[in-house]
């Protein structure tokens, strides 16, 4: 059973990459057992971020995001000495497959078009969420709980090279840039620290 595997003393890292709310119970169990969690299941933090954060403080579990945007924010924060100097977090999004489509033509959108993400190769649910920008809404909520910031904005960046930025009160920025390849944030998470 999954709970027994998660509780095992031999298990150090849990990769939580299941889709939807189904990820909440395994993420909760991994935190309960003090594991190092590579998190790609945003829904668990959207619905229970405060609870999961409080539990991780008690158990010593670490939550490391492996979504490209959240991994990028994590990397940017590593270079920040004073978080009070931060003005806002900026997540990027491609704008989805309909960014330049005439709004009057939206009624003709097909399911096949809605699942054809211009940058990332993803499953149908997250592709549809991305095509409607709903995925970005979920990522904003997740970022709030992962990083403790309320001022979070979105920048449409169709090329997918800039993954996230941090803006400081003096209006300077730091960003994480890379080719759009999920192997990069996953490898970073596996190798951190």
Language model: regions and residue ranges:
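Catalytic, metal-anchored helix/loop core of enzyme active sites in primary metabolism
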Residues: 1-193
